Amino acid sequence: MRLILFGGPGSGKGTQAAILTTLLGIPHISTGDILRAERAAGTLLGQQAQSYMDRGELVPDQVIVDMVANRLQQPDTAAGWLLDGFPRNGAQAAVFEEMLKSIHQDYDYLLFLDVPAAILQERALNRAKQAVNGQQRSDDTPETILKRLQVYERETLPMIQQYMSHPKFVPIDGTRTIEEVTAAIQARIGEVNRV
């Protein structure tokens, strides 16, 4: 199964992605993780991406599209994949759709974790206060969180609204508990084994 998971910062995308990929036995492909890995490896791409991520801005589309295309063609994606955090705007969506055609792939569902802006902000700011391995992510400061929320509302939400009429679009109430959100996704896509 090939899934695309949409939602704002703090919507629970990462949590649901981890659950679904375990249940389905498919890789979780996160552009954020790919970019952080490049940054940790000290690559030129990672250094370039770092400056954008630290400001809460989007990394240029072509860099992301090329990375995603390469990742979707890895051997571990044969049974499917879950793509989290991409596409993020209308331009990326158009290039992404063309890229999928060029590599002869398609997606089964566009899952949207629908969470109001005020709740997204509260969740994201709470996450920033929680350290991961004793360290806060450099892109999880209150300033960059607010910037990411603004970018989401300006760039990503209009793209999601365009996808709403797509027959594969599946809105999910993301304000519910983790378990309830997972159950709602399972009910809608119908192919995930129940826990």
From Swiss-Prot:
The keyword Cytoplasm applies. It catalyses: AMP + ATP = 2 ADP. It is found in: Cytoplasm. ATP binds at residues 10-15, 127, 176. Its main location: cytoplasm. It comes from the Bacteria. InterPro entries: Adenylat/UMP-CMP_kin, Adenylat_kinase_CS, P-loop_NTPase. GO terms for cellular component: cytoplasm. Monomer. HAMAP family: Adenylate_kinase_Adk. Consists of three domains, a large central CORE domain and two small peripheral domains, NMPbind and LID, which undergo movements during catalysis. The LID domain closes over the site of phosphoryl transfer upon ATP binding. Assembling and dissambling the active center during each catalytic cycle provides an effective means to prevent ATP hydrolysis. Belongs to the adenylate kinase family. This is Adenylate kinase. It comes from Thermosynechococcus vestitus (strain NIES-2133 / IAM M-273 / BP-1). The gene is adk.
